[in-house]
Amino acid sequence: MLIIRNKQELKEVILKQKQANKTIGFVPTMGFLHEGHMTLVSHARKESDFVVMSVFVNPTQFGPNEDFDAYPRDEAHDAKLAEEGGVDILFVPTVEEIYPTELSTKLHVDKRVSVLDGADREGHFDGVVTVLTKLFHLVSPDNAYFGQKDAQQVAVVSGLVEDYFFPVNLRIIATVREADGLAKSSRNVYLTEKERKEAPVIHEALQLGRKLIESGETNQAKIVQMMTEKINEQTSHELIAYLAIYSYPEFTPVTDWSKGIIIAAAVKYSKARLIDNELINVKRR
């Protein structure tokens, strides 16, 4: 496995692979890798000739009061897991390598971001599409791999790819969970012992919402109330950042319960904000 920090060196290696007609699979991450990331790598390894993983904590997707400086980082750990998983290139650029100067052209996401994380984290998705635009140009992937846990991000990135004709196939992989149902996340390390015991209730509440919808319930307020009560069995209502149901991938009010629907939750603990979701009537790509 090559560890590359320079974008010019990355482009040269990618060009050689392209000239050899190799398909490239790309797994963009912010590092502190866990089983969820490695599941994406496993799919990339099976479906691509050459696998590139990026580890870059992107400052433009963090708000002024968010955890950019505190976000967990462990390059040695990441490199070990990446090599064991069969990654060919681990791209680990500095902030200066990706953002050498102040941007003269800025991307702004208009749709699919007025609710949930888009509303809760102003400017977050602008930063996501900005860094992915840069990375897609550098890596030129045939396939790019994302997890369903970040479903709103997936919808936004799908819009980016469609709007700007990126020649990349997005592969959306099911959320990887702990044995008790908690979605694997780099932020789980921030949980206290008590919070870690409580956190699986997020997934339990989402499963309850799915069960109600699939049984024919269409009273959205009732569904959300029952999910809220489920979470409140383990934690306090004040910790719920959002618990909502929208059409997917549009993130608009549900008008047709037979089409794509997302049930989404975000819960704030003392040092971690955890998100999770359930998708209904949605096929992963």
From Swiss-Prot:
GO CC terms, sorted: cytosol
Biological process terms in GO annotation: pantothenate biosynthetic process
Listed Pfam families: Pantoate_ligase
The protein's annotated pathway: Cofactor biosynthesis; (R)-pantothenate biosynthesis; (R)-pantothenate from (R)-pantoate and beta-alanine: step 1/1
Binding site for (R)-pantoate: Q61, Q153
The EC number(s) this enzyme carries: 6.3.2.1
Tree of life domain: Bacteria
Binding site for ATP: 30-37, 147-150, 176, 184-187
InterPro entries in the cross-refs: Cyt_trans-like, Pantoate_ligase, Pantoate_ligase_C, Rossmann-like_a/b/a_fold
Enzyme class per UniProt: ligase
Localization of this protein: Cytoplasm
Keywords for the protein's UniProt record, in alphabetical order: ATP-binding, Cytoplasm, Ligase, Nucleotide-binding, Pantothenate biosynthesis
A GO term for molecular function: pantoate-beta-alanine ligase activity
Active site: H37
SUPFAM superfamilies tied to this protein: Nucleotidylyl transferase
Residues engaged in binding beta-alanine: Q61
Catalytic activity: (R)-pantoate + beta-alanine + ATP = (R)-pantothenate + AMP + diphosphate + H(+)
Family (UniProt): Belongs to the pantothenate synthetase family.
Extra remark: The reaction proceeds by a bi uni uni bi ping pong mechanism.
Entries under HAMAP family matching the protein: PanC
Subunit structure: Homodimer.
Function: Catalyzes the condensation of pantoate with beta-alanine in an ATP-dependent reaction via a pantoyl-adenylate intermediate.
Entry protein name: Pantothenate synthetase
Source organism of the structure: Listeria monocytogenes serovar 1/2a (strain ATCC BAA-679 / EGD-e)
